[in-house]
């Protein structure tokens, strides 16, 4: 069996992490070997980088370019240490965020140069793209209200509503640009309905 890279994307509070875990349980019930991972933080080095990137207690803010480079470093290590080896072993990797997050957050959200971002993504990934990306689409205000009701907000979650709306626009543009790779799922319904829709998509795209 060939390995597959299935990525879950979306704005804060879209439910991607929850749905990813539900998908893992479903795939394992089909006797498929599954690996759960995330960016940033999918390796030991990545965990340290995640702390730097998401901590809201830093004495000095991280510059936008530094932020971009830290995400790229996390991704490069993640691919070499986790993604490539597990794909080679035929495993299904479920990844919480990948390259589209960088385009949406650092490109659209921060307004950084898109050619720079694309070049860094290419260097970090070596051209490794997802087999399918599930974009959980929810209204920005709905997603942020979910996050506020769950836990303390990290540095990114505390950004302005205008920032998060730009991020959402980025995901919308990516969906339009890459229809063969990115599938939109309405994330506003119940967890059960959303999961059913995701399973139908994966059945069609990966198993038919």
Regions found by a protein language model. Give the residues of each.
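Walker A (P-loop) phosphate-binding loop of P-loop NTPases
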Residues: 13
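Conserved lysine of the Walker
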Residues: 16
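Pre-Walker A (Motif I) flank of P-loop NTPase domains
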Residues: 2-5
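Hydrophobic positions on the alpha1 helix immediately C-terminal to the Walker A/P-loop
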Residues: 19
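Hydrophobic anchor at the beta1->P-loop junction of P-loop NTPases
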Residues: 8
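A glycine- and Lys/Arg-enriched "phosphate-lid" helix/loop adjacent to the NTP-binding pocket
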Residues: 97, 101-169
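NTP-dependent small-molecule kinase module
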Residues: 24, 141-208
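ATP-dependent small-molecule kinase phosphotransfer cores
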Residues: 32-125, 197
């Amino acid at each position: 069996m060939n390995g597959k890279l299935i990525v879950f994307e979306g704005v804060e509070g879209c439910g991607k992490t929850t749905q990813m875990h539900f998908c893992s349980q479903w795939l394992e019930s089909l006797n498929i070997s599954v690996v759960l991972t995330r960016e940033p933080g999918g390796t030991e080095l990545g965990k340290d980088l995640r702390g730097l990137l998401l901590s809201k207690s830093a004495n000095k803010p991280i510059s936008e370019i530094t932020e971009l480079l830290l995400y790229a470093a996390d991704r490069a290590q993640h691919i070499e240490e986790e993604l490539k080896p597990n794909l080679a072993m035929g495993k299904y990797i479920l990844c919480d965020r990948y390259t589209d997050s960088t385009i949406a957050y650092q490109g659209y959200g921060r307004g950084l140069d898109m050619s720079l971002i694309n070049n860094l993504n290419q260097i970090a990934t070596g051209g490794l793209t997802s087999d399918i990306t599930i974009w959980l689409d929810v209204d920005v205000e709905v997603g942020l209200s979910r996050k506020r009701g769950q836990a303390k907000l990290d540095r990114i979650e505390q950004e302005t509503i205008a920032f998060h709306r730009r991020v959402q626009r980025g995901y919308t543009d990516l969906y339009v640009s890459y229809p063969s790779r990115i599938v939109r799922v309405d994330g506003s319904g119940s967890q059960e309905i959303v999961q059913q829709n995701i399973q139908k998509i994966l059945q069609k795209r990966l198993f038919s």
